[in-house]
Amino acid sequence: MFELTDAQRQLQQSARRLALEAIAPHAAQTDRSEQYPWHTVEALREQRLMGMTLPPEYGGKGASYFDTVLVIEELSKVCAASGRIMVESNMGAIGAIMKYGSDAQKQLAARLVLAGDKPAICITEPQAGSAASDMQTRAERRGDTWHLSGCKHWITGGGVSKLHFVFARAIEDGKDTGIAGFIVVGPDVPGMTIQRIPAMGIRGVPEARIEFDDMRVRHDMKVTPPGRTEAGFAGLMNAYNAQRVGAATVALGIAQGAFDLALDYAKRREQFGRPIAEFQGLQWMLADMSIQLEAARLMVWKAAASGSEFPSMFAAAQAKIAAGEAAIKVTNDALQIHGAVGYGRDLPLERMVRDARMFTISGGTAQILRTQVAGTLLGQKLSQRRSA
Protein backbone atom coordinates (compact mmCIF):
# COMPACT_ATOMS: atom_id res chain seq x y z
CA MET A 1 0.00 0.00 0.00
CA PHE A 2 2.89 2.35 0.82
CA GLU A 3 6.25 2.40 -0.92
CA LEU A 4 8.77 4.83 0.50
CA THR A 5 10.60 7.08 -1.93
CA ASP A 6 14.39 7.21 -1.98
CA ALA A 7 14.21 10.56 -0.19
CA GLN A 8 11.98 9.11 2.52
CA ARG A 9 14.29 6.14 3.02
CA GLN A 10 17.22 8.51 3.37
CA LEU A 11 15.27 10.58 5.91
CA GLN A 12 14.42 7.43 7.84
CA GLN A 13 18.04 6.25 7.85
CA SER A 14 19.29 9.67 8.89
CA ALA A 15 16.82 9.73 11.80
CA ARG A 16 17.93 6.22 12.78
CA ARG A 17 21.58 7.29 12.92
CA LEU A 18 20.67 10.35 14.95
CA ALA A 19 18.67 8.22 17.38
CA LEU A 20 21.44 5.66 17.88
CA GLU A 21 24.33 8.11 18.09
CA ALA A 22 22.92 11.18 19.84
CA ILE A 23 19.83 10.03 21.76
CA ALA A 24 20.10 6.35 22.77
CA PRO A 25 23.21 6.84 24.96
CA HIS A 26 21.25 9.26 27.18
CA ALA A 27 17.83 7.55 27.22
CA ALA A 28 18.23 5.62 30.48
CA GLN A 29 19.60 8.63 32.34
CA THR A 30 16.79 10.81 31.00
CA ASP A 31 14.30 8.37 32.52
CA ARG A 32 16.12 7.94 35.83
CA SER A 33 16.78 11.63 36.38
CA GLU A 34 13.34 12.70 35.15
CA GLN A 35 15.08 15.69 33.58
CA TYR A 36 14.09 17.21 30.26
CA PRO A 37 16.50 15.98 27.54
CA TRP A 38 17.90 19.26 26.30
CA HIS A 39 20.59 17.29 24.44
CA THR A 40 17.79 15.84 22.30
CA VAL A 41 16.37 19.28 21.64
CA GLU A 42 19.75 20.54 20.47
CA ALA A 43 20.29 17.50 18.23
CA LEU A 44 16.85 17.88 16.65
CA ARG A 45 17.29 21.60 16.21
CA GLU A 46 20.67 21.18 14.52
CA GLN A 47 19.10 18.74 12.03
CA ARG A 48 16.17 21.14 11.45
CA LEU A 49 13.72 18.51 12.69
CA MET A 50 12.13 20.79 15.29
CA GLY A 51 9.42 22.48 13.25
CA MET A 52 10.14 20.50 10.09
CA THR A 53 6.43 20.73 9.17
CA LEU A 54 6.51 24.54 9.23
CA PRO A 55 6.16 26.20 5.81
CA PRO A 56 9.48 27.34 4.30
CA GLU A 57 8.41 30.99 4.55
CA TYR A 58 8.34 30.53 8.32
CA GLY A 59 11.70 28.76 8.47
CA GLY A 60 10.60 25.13 8.24
CA LYS A 61 11.01 22.44 5.60
CA GLY A 62 7.34 22.17 4.70
CA ALA A 63 7.56 18.46 5.51
CA SER A 64 4.47 16.29 5.29
CA TYR A 65 3.02 14.52 8.30
CA PHE A 66 3.96 11.26 6.61
CA ASP A 67 7.64 12.22 6.46
CA THR A 68 7.45 13.43 10.04
CA VAL A 69 6.14 10.12 11.42
CA LEU A 70 9.08 8.34 9.80
CA VAL A 71 11.39 10.41 11.99
CA ILE A 72 9.23 10.08 15.11
CA GLU A 73 9.24 6.28 14.97
CA GLU A 74 13.02 6.06 14.73
CA LEU A 75 13.53 8.36 17.73
CA SER A 76 10.87 6.57 19.78
CA LYS A 77 12.54 3.18 19.31
CA VAL A 78 15.28 4.31 21.67
CA CYS A 79 13.68 7.14 23.69
CA ALA A 80 9.97 7.86 23.98
CA ALA A 81 10.61 11.28 25.51
CA SER A 82 12.53 12.32 22.41
CA GLY A 83 9.75 11.05 20.16
CA ARG A 84 7.24 13.05 22.19
CA ILE A 85 9.27 16.23 21.76
CA MET A 86 9.38 15.61 18.02
CA VAL A 87 5.59 15.20 17.90
CA GLU A 88 4.74 18.37 19.73
CA SER A 89 7.22 20.55 17.89
CA ASN A 90 5.54 19.59 14.62
CA MET A 91 1.91 18.68 15.35
CA GLY A 92 -1.02 19.76 17.49
CA ALA A 93 -0.69 23.28 18.89
CA ILE A 94 1.80 24.45 16.29
CA GLY A 95 -0.40 23.06 13.51
CA ALA A 96 -3.48 24.90 14.80
CA ILE A 97 -1.61 28.19 15.07
CA MET A 98 -0.08 27.85 11.60
CA LYS A 99 -3.51 27.09 10.14
CA TYR A 100 -5.70 29.58 11.97
CA GLY A 101 -3.39 32.19 13.47
CA SER A 102 -2.50 35.66 12.23
CA ASP A 103 0.84 36.24 10.54
CA ALA A 104 2.23 37.72 13.75
CA GLN A 105 1.06 34.69 15.73
CA LYS A 106 2.61 32.34 13.19
CA GLN A 107 5.91 34.23 13.28
CA LEU A 108 5.98 34.05 17.08
CA ALA A 109 5.18 30.34 17.23
CA ALA A 110 7.64 29.44 14.47
CA ARG A 111 10.43 31.43 16.07
CA LEU A 112 10.00 29.66 19.40
CA VAL A 113 9.82 26.17 17.90
CA LEU A 114 12.80 26.67 15.62
CA ALA A 115 14.78 27.85 18.65
CA GLY A 116 14.05 24.51 20.36
CA ASP A 117 10.72 24.96 22.15
CA LYS A 118 8.23 22.13 22.50
CA PRO A 119 4.76 23.75 22.61
CA ALA A 120 2.29 22.71 25.30
CA ILE A 121 -1.35 22.29 24.32
CA CYS A 122 -3.58 23.04 27.31
CA ILE A 123 -7.00 21.39 26.99
CA THR A 124 -7.53 18.84 29.77
CA GLU A 125 -8.93 19.94 33.14
CA PRO A 126 -9.49 18.05 36.41
CA GLN A 127 -13.20 17.63 35.60
CA ALA A 128 -12.96 17.79 31.80
CA GLY A 129 -10.95 14.94 30.31
CA SER A 130 -12.75 13.01 27.58
CA ALA A 131 -15.58 15.56 27.90
CA ALA A 132 -13.25 18.34 26.75
CA SER A 133 -16.06 20.77 25.94
CA ASP A 134 -17.02 20.77 29.65
CA MET A 135 -13.94 22.86 30.39
CA GLN A 136 -14.42 25.64 32.92
CA THR A 137 -11.32 27.75 32.32
CA ARG A 138 -12.57 31.23 31.41
CA ALA A 139 -11.08 34.09 29.45
CA GLU A 140 -12.95 37.31 30.10
CA ARG A 141 -12.36 40.21 27.74
CA ARG A 142 -11.73 43.62 29.21
CA GLY A 143 -10.83 46.03 26.46
CA ASP A 144 -7.81 44.72 24.56
CA THR A 145 -6.91 42.22 27.27
CA TRP A 146 -8.22 38.78 28.15
CA HIS A 147 -8.16 37.68 31.79
CA LEU A 148 -7.71 33.89 32.14
CA SER A 149 -8.77 31.99 35.23
CA GLY A 150 -8.99 28.24 35.71
CA CYS A 151 -6.95 25.06 35.95
CA LYS A 152 -5.45 22.74 33.35
CA HIS A 153 -4.28 19.24 34.23
CA TRP A 154 -1.88 16.68 32.73
CA ILE A 155 -0.27 19.27 30.49
CA THR A 156 2.71 17.74 28.72
CA GLY A 157 5.74 19.99 28.88
CA GLY A 158 4.44 22.17 31.69
CA GLY A 159 7.44 23.90 33.24
CA VAL A 160 9.77 23.54 30.24
CA SER A 161 7.58 24.72 27.36
CA LYS A 162 7.49 28.40 26.46
CA LEU A 163 4.64 28.34 23.95
CA HIS A 164 1.34 27.36 25.58
CA PHE A 165 -1.83 27.05 23.53
CA VAL A 166 -4.59 27.40 26.10
CA PHE A 167 -8.21 26.49 25.38
CA ALA A 168 -10.72 28.54 27.39
CA ARG A 169 -14.29 29.80 27.30
CA ALA A 170 -14.27 33.28 25.81
CA ILE A 171 -16.52 35.65 27.77
CA GLU A 172 -17.43 38.96 26.11
CA ASP A 173 -19.88 41.42 27.64
CA GLY A 174 -20.81 38.75 30.15
CA LYS A 175 -21.74 36.25 27.42
CA ASP A 176 -20.06 32.89 26.81
CA THR A 177 -19.16 33.06 23.11
CA GLY A 178 -17.62 29.59 22.94
CA ILE A 179 -14.21 28.01 23.29
CA ALA A 180 -11.20 29.72 21.77
CA GLY A 181 -7.45 29.22 21.81
CA PHE A 182 -5.02 31.67 23.42
CA ILE A 183 -1.27 31.88 22.93
CA VAL A 184 0.56 32.26 26.22
CA VAL A 185 4.34 32.57 26.28
CA GLY A 186 5.58 31.35 29.66
CA PRO A 187 6.30 29.76 31.98
CA ASP A 188 7.27 32.84 34.02
CA VAL A 189 4.06 34.81 33.63
CA PRO A 190 2.21 36.63 36.44
CA GLY A 191 -0.93 34.70 37.30
CA MET A 192 0.39 31.36 35.97
CA THR A 193 1.42 28.64 38.44
CA ILE A 194 2.87 25.29 37.36
CA GLN A 195 3.16 22.16 39.50
CA ARG A 196 4.73 18.97 38.17
CA ILE A 197 2.76 15.71 38.34
CA PRO A 198 4.94 12.61 38.95
CA ALA A 199 4.17 10.08 36.23
CA MET A 200 4.66 6.37 35.53
CA GLY A 201 6.40 6.74 32.19
CA ILE A 202 7.98 9.13 29.66
CA ARG A 203 9.54 10.80 32.66
CA GLY A 204 11.87 13.00 30.64
CA VAL A 205 8.96 15.19 29.53
CA PRO A 206 7.10 16.60 32.53
CA GLU A 207 3.36 16.43 33.06
CA ALA A 208 1.95 19.35 34.99
CA ARG A 209 -0.99 21.08 36.58
CA ILE A 210 -1.25 24.70 35.45
CA GLU A 211 -3.38 27.22 37.30
CA PHE A 212 -4.36 30.58 35.88
CA ASP A 213 -5.34 33.31 38.33
CA ASP A 214 -6.51 36.39 36.45
CA MET A 215 -3.62 35.98 34.02
CA ARG A 216 -3.61 38.64 31.35
CA VAL A 217 -3.32 37.87 27.64
CA ARG A 218 -3.32 40.45 24.87
CA HIS A 219 -6.30 40.33 22.51
CA ASP A 220 -4.00 39.74 19.54
CA MET A 221 -2.97 36.42 21.11
CA LYS A 222 -6.45 34.92 20.69
CA VAL A 223 -6.67 32.30 17.93
CA THR A 224 -10.11 31.49 16.55
CA PRO A 225 -10.85 30.10 13.08
CA PRO A 226 -13.27 32.11 10.91
CA GLY A 227 -16.96 31.54 11.56
CA ARG A 228 -18.89 30.77 14.73
CA THR A 229 -16.82 30.24 17.84
CA GLU A 230 -18.18 26.75 18.45
CA ALA A 231 -17.29 25.82 14.88
CA GLY A 232 -13.95 27.45 15.65
CA PHE A 233 -13.41 25.05 18.55
CA ALA A 234 -14.11 22.14 16.21
CA GLY A 235 -11.57 23.56 13.78
CA LEU A 236 -8.93 23.89 16.46
CA MET A 237 -9.61 20.32 17.55
CA ASN A 238 -9.12 19.12 13.96
CA ALA A 239 -5.48 20.08 14.38
CA TYR A 240 -5.39 17.72 17.36
CA ASN A 241 -5.92 14.78 14.98
CA ALA A 242 -2.33 15.26 13.85
CA GLN A 243 -1.17 15.07 17.46
CA ARG A 244 -3.02 11.77 17.83
CA VAL A 245 -1.21 10.38 14.80
CA GLY A 246 2.06 11.56 16.32
CA ALA A 247 1.24 9.90 19.63
CA ALA A 248 0.36 6.69 17.79
CA THR A 249 3.76 6.83 16.11
CA VAL A 250 5.57 7.17 19.43
CA ALA A 251 3.69 4.10 20.69
CA LEU A 252 4.64 2.26 17.50
CA GLY A 253 8.29 3.21 17.89
CA ILE A 254 8.41 2.04 21.51
CA ALA A 255 6.87 -1.28 20.50
CA GLN A 256 9.22 -1.75 17.54
CA GLY A 257 12.22 -1.03 19.74
CA ALA A 258 11.06 -3.62 22.28
CA PHE A 259 10.39 -6.19 19.55
CA ASP A 260 13.85 -5.70 18.06
CA LEU A 261 15.41 -6.41 21.45
CA ALA A 262 13.23 -9.47 22.02
CA LEU A 263 13.95 -10.98 18.60
CA ASP A 264 17.69 -10.55 19.03
CA TYR A 265 17.60 -11.98 22.56
CA ALA A 266 15.52 -15.00 21.50
CA LYS A 267 18.15 -15.89 18.91
CA ARG A 268 21.03 -15.63 21.40
CA ARG A 269 19.59 -16.92 24.66
CA GLU A 270 19.97 -20.68 25.13
CA GLN A 271 18.03 -22.97 27.47
CA PHE A 272 17.82 -26.77 27.37
CA GLY A 273 20.79 -26.75 25.01
CA ARG A 274 19.30 -24.64 22.23
CA PRO A 275 18.21 -21.04 21.45
CA ILE A 276 14.82 -20.20 22.93
CA ALA A 277 13.78 -18.98 19.47
CA GLU A 278 13.46 -22.67 18.55
CA PHE A 279 10.56 -23.17 20.97
CA GLN A 280 7.20 -23.00 19.22
CA GLY A 281 5.47 -21.15 22.05
CA LEU A 282 7.97 -18.33 21.79
CA GLN A 283 7.90 -18.40 17.97
CA TRP A 284 4.16 -17.73 18.05
CA MET A 285 4.70 -14.82 20.44
CA LEU A 286 7.19 -13.28 18.03
CA ALA A 287 4.88 -13.86 15.08
CA ASP A 288 1.95 -12.20 16.85
CA MET A 289 4.11 -9.26 17.88
CA SER A 290 5.24 -8.77 14.30
CA ILE A 291 1.67 -8.93 13.00
CA GLN A 292 0.47 -6.33 15.51
CA LEU A 293 3.35 -4.03 14.65
CA GLU A 294 2.84 -4.21 10.90
CA ALA A 295 -0.92 -3.66 11.22
CA ALA A 296 -0.38 -0.66 13.49
CA ARG A 297 2.26 0.81 11.18
CA LEU A 298 -0.01 0.61 8.15
CA MET A 299 -2.77 2.36 10.08
CA VAL A 300 -0.38 5.07 11.29
CA TRP A 301 0.92 5.65 7.79
CA LYS A 302 -2.59 5.71 6.37
CA ALA A 303 -3.66 8.26 8.99
CA ALA A 304 -0.61 10.43 8.37
CA ALA A 305 -1.42 10.49 4.66
CA SER A 306 -5.16 11.13 5.16
CA GLY A 307 -6.94 14.48 5.05
CA SER A 308 -6.21 17.56 2.99
CA GLU A 309 -4.68 19.65 5.80
CA PHE A 310 -4.90 17.58 8.97
CA PRO A 311 -5.30 13.81 9.29
CA SER A 312 -8.91 12.67 9.37
CA MET A 313 -10.47 12.08 12.79
CA PHE A 314 -11.53 8.57 11.77
CA ALA A 315 -8.09 7.45 10.58
CA ALA A 316 -6.29 9.16 13.47
CA ALA A 317 -8.55 7.49 16.05
CA GLN A 318 -8.12 4.06 14.47
CA ALA A 319 -4.35 4.46 14.33
CA LYS A 320 -4.04 5.61 17.93
CA ILE A 321 -6.17 2.74 19.22
CA ALA A 322 -4.26 0.15 17.19
CA ALA A 323 -0.78 1.46 17.97
CA GLY A 324 -1.50 2.18 21.63
CA GLU A 325 -2.88 -1.27 22.33
CA ALA A 326 -0.16 -2.96 20.27
CA ALA A 327 2.49 -1.09 22.25
CA ILE A 328 1.16 -2.35 25.58
CA LYS A 329 0.97 -5.96 24.34
CA VAL A 330 4.27 -6.01 22.46
CA THR A 331 6.34 -4.38 25.20
CA ASN A 332 4.95 -6.76 27.83
CA ASP A 333 5.61 -9.77 25.59
CA ALA A 334 9.12 -8.52 24.87
CA LEU A 335 9.77 -8.30 28.60
CA GLN A 336 8.33 -11.81 29.06
CA ILE A 337 10.69 -13.21 26.43
CA HIS A 338 13.63 -11.71 28.32
CA GLY A 339 12.43 -13.18 31.61
CA ALA A 340 14.00 -11.82 34.79
CA VAL A 341 16.67 -9.87 32.92
CA GLY A 342 13.90 -7.86 31.24
CA TYR A 343 12.40 -7.06 34.62
CA GLY A 344 15.65 -5.49 35.75
CA ARG A 345 16.75 -1.95 35.07
CA ASP A 346 19.88 -2.81 33.12
CA LEU A 347 17.81 -3.15 29.93
CA PRO A 348 15.33 -0.57 28.58
CA LEU A 349 12.38 -3.01 28.55
CA GLU A 350 10.90 -2.07 31.91
CA ARG A 351 11.08 1.58 30.81
CA MET A 352 9.38 0.73 27.52
CA VAL A 353 6.56 -1.06 29.35
CA ARG A 354 6.00 2.01 31.51
CA ASP A 355 6.27 4.43 28.59
CA ALA A 356 3.80 2.50 26.44
CA ARG A 357 1.03 2.55 29.02
CA MET A 358 0.00 6.15 28.47
CA PHE A 359 -1.02 5.79 24.84
CA THR A 360 -4.45 4.30 25.47
CA ILE A 361 -5.14 7.09 27.97
CA SER A 362 -3.83 10.53 27.03
CA GLY A 363 -4.92 12.38 23.92
CA GLY A 364 -8.18 10.44 23.84
CA THR A 365 -8.74 7.15 25.65
CA ALA A 366 -9.08 4.00 23.58
CA GLN A 367 -12.70 3.81 24.74
CA ILE A 368 -13.73 7.34 23.73
CA LEU A 369 -11.89 6.97 20.41
CA ARG A 370 -13.82 3.78 19.71
CA THR A 371 -17.00 5.79 20.20
CA GLN A 372 -15.76 8.30 17.62
CA VAL A 373 -14.94 5.52 15.17
CA ALA A 374 -18.36 3.95 15.69
CA GLY A 375 -20.06 7.31 15.21
CA THR A 376 -18.36 7.73 11.84
CA LEU A 377 -19.35 4.22 10.77
CA LEU A 378 -22.97 4.84 11.78
CA GLY A 379 -23.08 8.36 10.38
CA GLN A 380 -24.07 10.01 13.65
CA LYS A 381 -22.59 11.66 16.70
CA LEU A 382 -22.83 9.24 19.60
CA SER A 383 -23.32 11.39 22.68
CA GLN A 384 -22.14 9.93 25.97
CA ARG A 385 -24.20 12.35 28.03
CA ARG A 386 -26.99 11.06 30.20
CA SER A 387 -30.40 11.84 28.71
CA ALA A 388 -32.56 14.31 30.61
UniProtKB/Swiss-Prot annotation:
Residues that, per the record, bind substrate: 240-241
Reactions that this protein is recorded to catalyse: 3-sulfinopropanoyl-CoA + H2O = propanoyl-CoA + sulfite + H(+)
Keyword Flavoprotein: yes
Source organism, top-level taxon: Bacteria
EC number: 3.13.1.4
Cofactor: FAD
Residues where FAD binds: 121-124, 130, 153-156, 269, 336, 363-367, 384
Keyword annotations: FAD, Flavoprotein, Hydrolase
Entries under SUPFAM superfamilies matching the protein: Acyl-CoA dehydrogenase C-terminal domain-like, Acyl-CoA dehydrogenase NM domain-like
Subunit annotation: Homotrimer or homotetramer.
Function: Catalyzes the conversion 3-sulfinopropanoyl-CoA (3SP-CoA) to propanoyl-CoA by abstraction of sulfite. Does not show dehydrogenase activity.
Protein family (similarity comment): Belongs to the acyl-CoA dehydrogenase family.
Name of the molecule in the record: 3-sulfinopropanoyl-CoA desulfinase
Organism of origin: Paraburkholderia xenovorans (strain LB400)
Lineage of origin: Bacteria, Pseudomonadati, Pseudomonadota, Betaproteobacteria, Burkholderiales
Gene name of the encoded protein: acd
